[in-house]
């Protein structure tokens, strides 16, 4: 209005004047007459859209003279005025008829037609402004079909366009437009338009067809369907949408909806085990189609997703050590609860956790045996048949203090040790008994077992091993589990009461037993849980208390206390195993402990035997419990306890051995002073009972199936005889056996356990009655059996403490009590042993002990150090087992030897008397041949401290340094246990020598040992062999104990690391065991050994400490070896004698263990390799490790280089164990992993493990659970999807998502922007020199990792031991900080990493073990079919790196992968093999192929590749870590309702040289505190960047590949974080210029053979978003196709007969994406994906492949056949043939 007023001032002015004159109010007649009219005030005239607006205010005196109305007169002159009356309430008026003329017509009218609408646009008329008399006030739009009535639409004066909708298609419409004002309308403007023909979309929308619902998980399904419109190959309609509706089955359920734009939808957040109804409809625009017919699908049952609520704990009146626990039952929606697992631990001792298992109907329970004055944390979780649920929130309860010593003693293994043995037993007994009494017998046993299990887990016992044992037990009556279970059931009540009574009667024994049990957990920690405790308790009590109170089985309390100690390390692992095993495991454990008690109490040989066997079974199982028992046992068992503790910790790695060892050690060192005296008693007692059983077990395990069994039988016979002599002892013996078992796969085997039972009892008796020397003597005669005892003592025994028990016997004959005392200390150290560091500290003590031991043993073979270790063991264990050497024969002697051996390596010579050594040696060679004779080792270690040392050494030397190291650990464990029964001295020493490395290693070794039966003694398995031969291998345990004694204070720290290491060991062992079985003992051992060092090497401070000790031990060993090279079996230096060991595989067995010990400490896996001659398995393993970062994978090809004396440090005599000799055929299967590596499928634990014992993870970072398929041969996941074919081939993807969360095998992981690396394998770029000076008095020769072992021994092929520390490791979590992770290849050369052969091939080595290089400086390689895959050598680095085990149930310990095979390379920087590719901020070549300079910036990282290799995004992504969802998605999204507050940092562009088509954008995680569930990655080319047009992609991890990039083009990238509450800030953008295109993609090599033949192919957009070219390569496959998709080369096998057929994307689990290489699934016609249940697969004709890189075959596939469907092709693995 204002503008218009200005526009026509004259008109307005004039009108205003006229209006003012005419605007007159008319007053009412009321009131006095007034002469003058009322004048309105503030009259204004304004221009409006439709005319003139007049406004005014009422007159001043309007109140006194009310206004009736206003008159408005207006006109262009006073002559032509018009007047209007307005009522009195109005103060404004609009005058409309003020225009002069009608407006002009609109201009430039245009009409555009579509199918059902017209768009009209125009310009304003001329002269339509406010001044114009023809101004327009609006428009009138008319439209209608020609010849019909028009429809009119008024429009405002400002509109210039309009759309007419809902018109008929294919019709002619007339459109008119007029402008209007107050004078009228302008002339119309007409236009005619024809609407277009409507599309078929007008027809009714199609109904989706072929709706399929694929189960993705228990809570998500993938719904897919076919759109008939798209299927008819019509065009794809962009506006087409699809809606999926779903609800629980039932009419009353509410529908939920999900709308998507593609033809598949992932429906998540479903309820497990529920039937859902699904339907789909198509929508387009505003129209919706009809719903399809419903499809029903049941979601599979899943593990509970919630924890039981309302956990409450309160004390029981009048019972200060008892609490009542109650909880709410889990809702039915979580599935039928099978059992509840209650975990509790002292608040200040988180590793002392125990767990009890209750039936699914139970909601309350009594928990007994708590420590007064302690604060306990209680947690509970539920399990159903699909797995375990999460833990509940912790409930903390303070136990009231009480004057009762019992209560306090029970929890403390140490306190128990201090009191008189009987007192402790009673204390222990109350604990165990109480639990039994308070619960129903079954429940009690079960609880006790679970407690033990928990302890074992806590102590780091590998659940896998335990579980294996338990499973084996279940399968085979002989196996510990079956026996344990049966006994549990049958003896549940009796046993319970018996346990209680026994515990009361023989509390001290329990510790000793416990120690053994701790050892046992490595093997079958779960089963060992309680039974081991009992047995161990019995053993311990029997050892010292055995004579006085055979009954004080009450020890179980002590044992449980020990368990607590050890449980820190073992329990978690064992618990996991137990959990996996289920309640049976706990049951077995408790039953085992019960039988043990009965066995002890029973005088008859038969009962003893039974008890022994039970104990054996139990031992492995009770390991944790054993610990507890040891605790109770207090210090008869103090040393015993220590030993057990240490053993238990080792147990984590080595189910029983380690745990047992750890427990006794920790206990021992704690109560060390107290225990010296009682220790000697315990040792003596334990030794006799422990040794035989250990012997039996060791031999059984070591030998593999047959050897083990044979040894077990022999041992049993002896044990029986002995059992009769020492009825109570048998339990010990059994316990020993059990310990051994965990280390050897065989021990897992069902047949092993039965034998073990008999022999254990007998050996127990025998050792008790006989001195170590006697046992040793027997050992030769009874190689397997004797070895078993010795071996048991040594290998399993290490974990077991039975060997120490045997030592006790020994101490009776020859060792001074004070040495036994040392043993005790060593035992205490045992727990430390797990953490090698303790070894260092104990070394001084060890040296003292060693000195004492050596003099008693007279086994000079050990270097002064070794002797020191021995002596230390003997000294410490002297009180326990005065005759350390004698004790060797029994468990006690052996533990000292065991420890000795681990401790310096001199331990190898350790307690073996020269004759003993020879015996051992001969035995060992025998065993080795049989089963990597643990026997030999045992023999070597039987007689004297030397023997013990040699025994410890023996296994190592013969089999492998690796194995030796493992065996050392095992020995440590054994010793730990041994200290209880026998001399902790050895234990300490061995422990000192190899606690850190050995412990973890032992487990692996034991595992491998099964493969290399002979080798168990050496590396765990190796220990066993020693054990059988003599207790000396056990002596190693004492060595550890010695170490512990020396480092009593360190024990606690050591213990902690130990658990982790133990756990690692367990995994490694387990894997090794399987692997070893398939690959060969040597190989297996080698891996395990290697594994050990890495796990215990200075990954953490403890590990470092251990490393030092190990180094020292190694030095000792080397010295000893040098001193007594010929005598190697008795005590040759681990390192020095390794080469010689190789030459003298059998004899050097003793030395070998020593070497192992050293080598472990030094982290020179190679050293163990040299042992390989003695222990072929070890060398094999070493080789594998060398080859592979993850030694486990290395295992597969033992045969080829085994015989070469210098091959990778393996001895020539390296023996391969035929696949058939697998220790536990039922429990583990070895399969071919990616890149020629070997993986172990552990059916007992339901895991897939690599050589390091790490388990394969699912997409959530949890262990991938597997089970046996319907045909009894195929391995499937819990959903029934086949994972491993009956022939041992993995069927799961080997792409970057199919591997464990870790780096690709030989590819460095990028750590960009300082991002920490997490995963199974985290590589430490800095490698620690393994050499450490040994604390023992023996001079320790530190052997730098770079130095090769003495010439006599084969070069230790240890690559630099770069440890991969997992973030979980507390001591030192090293993240791979360097961008460039280099793996050192293990080459004979000590200092420099050498080039490695490509995957699938192996390097050639000369007789000296040196790489044979071609003229071009590249190693000569041969096909992988041979012994190992080429990868084994490739990365030594991972071998040494620490690995973290992620599963909660398993101990969270970083295990160091086996040390690389590089003999003694400088610690070093791993070198990236060209094949693996290097990572650098600068390209290797400054210019690209077109001569253009490559783009360089601070945020750009280049990956190098072989110029001849194609560009593969798959390969590039292998450099990136796949993070688990646990890390990516926070647990509690509700704690923060804000969007991310910070932009992603450190954005890095990773490019591959020579590849322009893709880059990978990487960035750092969000700032802590920001809740981030995903990221948006923006990318734009330069042109798009200028126009601010960005493409976005989502990523759930911190890197994303950007594909389809053009050559020589600048791109910009930025990243934004998001969460459910919104998006965070966007990061600054970074730019990158791609390199020029490669004009030589398809080339003809000099030979003229076309590498690729390109041609186009059809593609179906419904299955793939990518299209492109495919390059066909001639291979032995039917058709091999490399497909260039999205400009990035991918690989696929195309099985179509016609290569021009339609290409379907290679589906991943979502059914989309081309990122996986695999064979096309014959069942899905090219659309690959997982099957919900294998049983649902029909039998049809299809393609399948049996072995990796084998031609595809055609035949019957499906359920019921060996081939369910075609497996995956390994992505990222170089394709066979030349590229």
Swiss-Prot record:
The keyword Nucleotide-binding does not apply. The modification Phosphoserine is found at residues 651, 699. Residues 534-554, 707-720, 1098-1108 have a biased composition (Basic and acidic residues). Pfam families: fn3, TARSH_C. Residues 33-126, 103-203, 207-302, 307-402, 1543-1637 form the Fibronectin type-III domain. Induction: By ischemia. Glycans are attached at residue 1546. This is Fibronectin type III domain-containing protein 1. It comes from Rattus norvegicus.
């Amino acid at each position: 209005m204002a503008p218009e007023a200005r526009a026509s001032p004259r008109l307005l002015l004039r009108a205003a004047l006229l209006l003012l004159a005419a605007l007159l109010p008319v007053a009412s007649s009321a009131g006095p007459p007034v002469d003058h009219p009322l004048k309105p005030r503030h009259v204004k005239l304004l221009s409006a859209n439709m005319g003139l607006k007049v406004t005014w205010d009422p007159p001043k005196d309007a109140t006194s003279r009310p206004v009736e109305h206003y008159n408005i007169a207006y006109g262009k002159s006073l002559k032509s005025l018009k007047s209007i009356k307005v009522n009195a309430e109005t103060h404004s008026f609009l005058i409309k008829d003020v225009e002069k003329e009608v407006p002009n017509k609109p201009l430039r009218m245009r009409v555009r037609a579509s199918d059902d609408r017209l768009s009209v646009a125009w310009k304003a008329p001329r002269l339509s402004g406010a001044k114009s008399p023809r101004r327009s006030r609006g428009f009138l739009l008319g439209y209608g079909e020609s010849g019909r009535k028009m429809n009119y639409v008024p429009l405002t004066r400002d509109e210039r366009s309009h759309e007419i909708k809902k018109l008929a298609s294919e019709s002619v419409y007339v459109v008119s437009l007029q402008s209007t004002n107050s004078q009228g309308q302008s002339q119309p403007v007409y236009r005619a338009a024809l609407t277009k023909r409507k599309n078929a979309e007008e027809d009714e929308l199609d109904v989706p067809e072929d709706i399929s619902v694929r189960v993705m998980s228990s809570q998500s399904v993938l719904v897919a369907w076919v759109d008939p419109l798209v299927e008819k190959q019509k065009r794809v309609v962009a506006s087409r949408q699809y809606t999926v509706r779903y609800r629980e089955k039932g009419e009353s359920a509410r529908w939920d909806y999900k709308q998507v734009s593609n033809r598949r939808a992932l429906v998540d957040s479903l309820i497990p085990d529920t039937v859902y109804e699904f339907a789909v409809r198509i929508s387009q625009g505003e129209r919706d189609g009809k719903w399809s017919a419903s499809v029903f699908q049941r979601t599979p049952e899943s593990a509970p997703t919630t924890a039981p609520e309302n956990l409450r704990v309160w004390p029981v009146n009048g019972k200060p050590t008892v609490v009542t626990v109650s909880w709410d039952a889990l809702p039915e929606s979580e599935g039928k609860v099978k059992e509840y697992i209650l975990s509790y631990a002292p608040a200040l001792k988180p590793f002392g956790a125990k767990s009890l298992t209750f039936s699914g109907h139970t909601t309350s329970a009594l928990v007994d045996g708590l420590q007064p004055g302690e604060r306990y944390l209680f947690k509970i979780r539920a399990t159903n048949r699909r797995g375990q649920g999460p833990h509940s929130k912790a409930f903390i309860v303070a136990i009231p203090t009480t004057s009762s010593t019992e209560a306090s003693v029970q929890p403390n293994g140490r306190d128990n040790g201090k009191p008189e043995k009987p007192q402790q037993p009673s204390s222990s007994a109350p604990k165990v008994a109480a639990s039994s009494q308070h619960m129903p017998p079954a429940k009690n046993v079960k609880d006790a077992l679970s407690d033990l299990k928990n302890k074992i887990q806590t102590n780091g016992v590998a659940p896998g091993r335990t579980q294996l044992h338990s499973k084996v037990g279940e399968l085979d009556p002989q196996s510990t589990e079956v026996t344990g279970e049966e006994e549990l059931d049958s003896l549940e009540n009796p046993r319970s009461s018996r346990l209680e009574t026994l515990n009361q009667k023989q509390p001290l024994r329990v510790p000793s037993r416990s120690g053994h049990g701790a050892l046992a957990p490595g093997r079958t920690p779960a089963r060992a849980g309680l039974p081991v405790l009992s047995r161990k308790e019995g053993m311990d009590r029997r050892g010292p208390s055995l004579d006085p109170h055979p009954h004080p089985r009450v020890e179980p309390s002590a044992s449980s206390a020990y368990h607590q100690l050890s449980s820190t390390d073992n329990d978690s692992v064992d618990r996991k195993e137990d959990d996996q095993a289920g309640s049976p495991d706990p049951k077995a454990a408790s039953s085992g402990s019960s039988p043990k008690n009965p066995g002890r109490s029973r005088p008859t040989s038969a009962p003893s035997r039974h008890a022994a066997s039970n104990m054996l079974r139990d031992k492995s199982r009770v390991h944790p419990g054993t610990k507890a028992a040891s605790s109770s046992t207090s210090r008869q068992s103090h040393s015993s306890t220590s030993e057990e503790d240490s053993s238990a910790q080792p147990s984590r790695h080595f189910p029983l051995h380690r745990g047992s060892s750890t427990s006794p050690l920790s206990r021992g060192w704690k109560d060390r002073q107290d225990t010296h005296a009682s220790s000697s008693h315990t040792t003596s007692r334990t030794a006799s009972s422990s040794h035989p059983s250990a012997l039996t077990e060791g031999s059984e395990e070591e030998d593999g199936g047959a050897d083990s069994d044979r040894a077990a039988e022999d041992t049993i016979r002896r044990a029986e005889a002995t059992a009769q002599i020492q009825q109570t002892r048998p339990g010990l013996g059994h316990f020993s056996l059990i310990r051994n078992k965990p280390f050897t796969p065989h021990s897992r085997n069902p047949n092993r356990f039965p034998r073990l039972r008999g022999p254990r009892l007998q050996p127990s008796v025998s050792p008790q009655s006989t001195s170590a020397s006697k046992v040793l003597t027997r050992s030769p005669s009874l190689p397997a059996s004797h070895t078993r005892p010795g071996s048991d003592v040594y290998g399993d025994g290490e974990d077991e403490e039975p060997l120490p028990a045997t030592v006790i016997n020994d101490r009776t004959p020859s060792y001074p009590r004070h040495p036994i005392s040392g043993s005790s200390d060593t035992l205490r150290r045992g727990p430390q042993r797990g953490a090698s560091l303790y070894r260092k500290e104990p070394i001084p003590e060890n040296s003292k002990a060693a000195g004492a031991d050596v003099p008693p043993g007279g086994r000079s073979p050990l270097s002064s150090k070794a002797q020191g270790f021995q002596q230390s063991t003997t000294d410490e264990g002297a009180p326990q087992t005065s005759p350390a050497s004698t004790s060797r024969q029994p468990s006690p002697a052996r533990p000292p030897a065991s420890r000795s051996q681990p401790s310096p390596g001199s331990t190898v010579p350790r307690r073996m008397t020269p004759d003993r050594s020879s015996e051992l040696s001969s035995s060992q060679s025998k065993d080795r041949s049989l089963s990597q004779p643990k026997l030999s080792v045992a023999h070597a270690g039987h007689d004297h401290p030397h023997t013990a040392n040699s025994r410890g050494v023996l296994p190592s030397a013969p089999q492998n340094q690796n194995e030796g190291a493992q065996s050392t650990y095992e020995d440590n464990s054994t010793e730990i246990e041994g200290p209880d029964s026998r001399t902790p001295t050895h234990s300490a020493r061995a422990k000192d020598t190899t606690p850190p490395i050995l412990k973890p290693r032992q487990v692996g070794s034991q595992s491998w040992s099964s493969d290399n039966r002979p080798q168990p003694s050496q590396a765990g398995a190796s220990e066993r062999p020693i054990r059988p031969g003599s207790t000396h291998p056990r002596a190693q345990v004492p060595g550890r104990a010695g170490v512990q004694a020396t480092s009593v204070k360190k024990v606690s720290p050591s213990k902690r690391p130990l658990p982790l290491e133990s756990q690692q060991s367990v995994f490694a062992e387990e894997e090794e065991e399987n692997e070893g079985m398939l690959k060969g003992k040597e190989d297996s051992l080698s891996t395990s050994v290697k594994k050990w060092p890495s796990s215990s090497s200075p990954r953490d401070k403890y590990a470092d400490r251990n490393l030092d000790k190990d180094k020292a031990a190694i030095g000792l060993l080397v010295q000893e070896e040098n001193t007594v090279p010929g005598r190697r079996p008795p005590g040759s230096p681990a390192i020095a004698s390794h080469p010689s060991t190789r030459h003298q595989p059998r004899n050097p067995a003793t030395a070998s263990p020593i070497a192992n010990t050293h080598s472990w400490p030094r982290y020179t896996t190679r050293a163990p390799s040299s042992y390989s001659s003695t222990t072929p398995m070890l060398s094999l393993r070493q080789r594998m490790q060398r080859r592979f970062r993850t030694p486990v994978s290395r295992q597969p090809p033992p045969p080829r280089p085994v015989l070469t004396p210098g091959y990778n440090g393996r001895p020539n005599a390296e023996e391969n164990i035929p696949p058939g000799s697998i220790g536990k055929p039922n429990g583990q299967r070895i399969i071919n992993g990616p890149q020629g590596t070997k993986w172990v499928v552990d059916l007992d634990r339901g895991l897939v493990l690599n050589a390091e014992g790490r388990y394969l993870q699912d997409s959530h970072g949890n262990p991938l659970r597997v089970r046996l398929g319907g045909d009894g041969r195929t391995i499937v996941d819990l959903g029934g999807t086949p994972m491993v074919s009956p022939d041992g081939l993995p069927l799961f993807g080997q792409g970057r998502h199919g591997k464990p969360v870790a780096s690709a095998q030989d590819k460095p992981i990028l750590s960009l922007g300082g991002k920490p690396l997490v995963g199974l394998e985290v590589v430490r770029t800095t490698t620690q020199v393994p050499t450490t000076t040994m604390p023992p008095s023996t001079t320790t020769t530190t052997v730098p990792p770079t130095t090769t072992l003495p010439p006599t021994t084969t070069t230790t092929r240890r690559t630099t031991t770069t440890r991969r520390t997992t973030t979980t490791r507390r001591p030192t979590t090293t993240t791979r900080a360097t961008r460039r992770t280099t793996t050192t290849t293990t080459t004979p050369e000590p200092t420099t990493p050498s080039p490695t052969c490509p995957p699938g091939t192996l390097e050639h080595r000369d007789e000296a073990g040196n790489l044979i290089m071609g003229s071009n400086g590249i190693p000569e390689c041969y096909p992988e079919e041979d012994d190992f895959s080429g990868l084994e050598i490739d990365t030594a680095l991972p071998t040494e790196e620490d690995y973290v085990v992620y599963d909660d149930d398993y101990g969270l310990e970083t295990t160091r992968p086996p040390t690389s095979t590089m003999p003694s390379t400088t610690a070093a920087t791993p070198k990236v093999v060209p094949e693996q590719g290097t990572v650098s901020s600068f390209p290797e070549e400054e210019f690209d192929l077109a001569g253009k300079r490559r783009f360089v910036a601070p945020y750009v990282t280049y990956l190098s590749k072989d110029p001849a290799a194609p560009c593969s995004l798959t390969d590039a992504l292998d450099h990136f870590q796949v993070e688990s969802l646990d890390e990516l998605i926070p647990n509690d999204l509700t704690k923060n309702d804000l969007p991310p507050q910070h932009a992603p940092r450190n954005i890095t562009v990773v490019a591959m040289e020579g590849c322009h088509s893709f880059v990978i954008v990487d960035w750092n995680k969000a700032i802590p505190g920001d809740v981030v569930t995903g990221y948006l990655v923006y990318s734009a080319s330069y042109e798009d960047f200028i126009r601010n047009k960005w493409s976005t992609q989502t990523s759930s991890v911190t890197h994303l590949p950007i594909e389809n990039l053009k050559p020589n083009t600048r791109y910009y990238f930025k990243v934004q974080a998001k969460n459910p509450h919104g998006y965070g800030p966007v990061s600054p953008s970074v730019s990158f210029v791609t390199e020029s295109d490669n004009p030589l993609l398809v080339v003809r090599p000099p030979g003229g053979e076309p590498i690729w033949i390109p041609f186009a192919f059809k593609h179906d957009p419904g299955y793939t978003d990518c299209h492109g070219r495919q390059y066909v390569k001639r291979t032995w496959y039917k058709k091999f196709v490399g497909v260039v998709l999205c400009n990035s080369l991918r690989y696929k096998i195309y099985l179509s007969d016609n290569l021009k057929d339609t290409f379907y994307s290679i589906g991943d689990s979502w059914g989309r994406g081309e990122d996986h290489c695999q064979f096309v699934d014959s069942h899905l016609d090219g659309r690959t994906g997982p099957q919900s249940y294998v049983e649902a697969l029909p039998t049809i004709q299809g393609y399948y492949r049996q072995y990796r890189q084998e031609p595809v075959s055609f035949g019957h596939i499906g359920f019921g056949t060996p081939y369910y469907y075609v497996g995956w092709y390994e992505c990222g693995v170089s394709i066979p043939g030349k590229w």
